[in-house]
């Protein structure tokens, strides 16, 4: 009854808080660039991150999770705050362009559409292995290359991939649909349907 309605209200409030912040402080460039560096991935609003963490905890409440995996650099801040609600450590995959990578790491390739280059991401084998139940966390999902690279590391480690928590998904780009079609559970808090410099951001559930 009352408690259920209160919970529903607090859940909606968290999502509205995030969407309102994107509308207010996000800067749209063209039709596909959304800059949220004033609160998400350069300067970070940790109180907002806490609400995001609570929402991911709610969505993955029934899941056993003992590791959170993200990618450097912009995923680290959000992953650390989220991890407090799951009471587990955070691992961040390191980007490297070194050719001679030691054998004590899992490695995967990621194509950066922003920078137009391919790089390797690595995680030390001592931190990820069979028996681990992993939640991926990242700030953005667009083409899905980073998420795919992280998922490959989990697979190579023989660990279980529980799902992915994404703060902002560009729903008009193919990554989310492609990865969901492969069976990955993706929980995206704000799904952007379209954007332009005049009208700003339109969300998928508006």
Where are these regions (language model features)?
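Conserved acidic residues
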Residues: 66, 132, 162
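Short glycine-rich phosphate-binding loop at a beta-alpha junction
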Residues: 65-72
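Short, glycine/charge-rich flexible loops or terminal/linker lids adjacent to PRPP-binding catalytic cores
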Residues: 88-134, 200-205
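Active-site/ligand-binding-proximal alpha/beta "capping" segment
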Residues: 130, 138-156
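PRPP-dependent phosphoribosyltransferase catalytic core
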Residues: 4-14, 20-21, 32, 151-206
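Active-site-facing substrate-recognition patch
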Residues: 4-65
